């Protein structure tokens, strides 16, 4: 009789262990799926920065994915600060001419374009009409 009680207890313990393991695995799977869907739903922002852009404007948009700076900005006082806001150096693209941005916009999944009044935006507006534009003045 004692043997069958131990056997039942061992089976119950094993069942609880398996149930707990499955729960933890399922919970991790759900968390991973939520993280993936959150990253997919996160807005992709391209920020055009030049020498007239204030540091406050750069900070305001620093949580987003992409900065695009003119060469003059990279040679200015903003250089180290701008790069410190970018989570990875590959996310800081360098460009001299706003028109050449069109190539990037056509190949990247960008939802919002933020630019400074110094940059001409008419060609960008006409060729990339699916974007939300935010003018920083």
Swiss-Prot record:
Gene Ontology MF terms: ubiquitin-protein transferase activator activity
One example of a Gene Ontology biological process annotation: protein import into peroxisome matrix, receptor recycling
A single GO cellular-component term on record: peroxisomal membrane
Origin: domain of life: Eukaryota
Listed name of the protein: Uncharacterized protein C57A7.15c
Source organism of the structure: Schizosaccharomyces pombe (strain 972 / ATCC 24843)
Lineage, top ranks: Eukaryota, Fungi, Dikarya, Ascomycota, Taphrinomycotina
């Amino acid at each position: 009789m004692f043997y069958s009680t131990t056997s039942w207890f061992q089976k119950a313990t094993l069942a609880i262990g398996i149930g707990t393991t499955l729960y933890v695995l399922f919970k991790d799977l759900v968390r991973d799926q939520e993280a993936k869907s959150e990253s997919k739903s996160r807005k992709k922002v391209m920020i055009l920065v030049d020498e007239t852009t204030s540091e406050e404007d750069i900070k305001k948009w620093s949580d987003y994915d992409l900065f695009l700076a003119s060469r003059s900005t990279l040679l200015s006082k903003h250089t180290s600060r701008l790069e410190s806001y970018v989570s990875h150096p590959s996310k800081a693209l360098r460009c001299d001419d706003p028109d050449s941005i069109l190539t990037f916009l056509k190949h990247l999944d960008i939802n919002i374009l933020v630019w400074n009044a110094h940059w001409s935006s008419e060609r960008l507006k006409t060729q990339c009409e699916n974007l939300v534009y935010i003018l920083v003045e």
